[in-house]
């Protein structure tokens, strides 16, 4: 296929992705009240907490932020399909199977990480932070709450990719089967640094983030050993 045809096909597929994103954004914005109801579940049981808006347009900003994230999630399968369809002609059957397997596994791990954070970590963390000072009522900005929730959700989703990355690197012999064991001390330091970077500046938030990351690292070591020897 001539190079011009490739650019035309790429342009049309990017346009499809953009149109789907806009449609998903408009639908999400229309149902923003429902999205807010779902995202506020981790703090529903905290009686001492009250959310406030600190700026005239903060409520609108929150709706735009939630709708953008929801639109990205809803449009992601279509965008991935367009990307895959664009590259499929140049891929061998084995490469196609690897890409599909990695995508499905990575998506599953991401959803597990996000769900674990949403239903387990965040309710406990928000409850502790809201109840920490018993002498004062907790007043949080709605925008700050959503930003913090999204940041932590994304962090857990990305961290849960470690076993997938380990399997990929081990299978193709990019790293040795004992790589993650040899670099355990460095990994502890890196995980602690990441925990401190993406969580509020308090010890409990760091522990809530560090605990699952350590467990995932142990799972990553096992995956690394299995795929490293089996490849």
Regions from the language model: what does each represent?
Residues 1-231:
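Membrane topogenic/interface segments and analogous intrinsically disordered interaction regions
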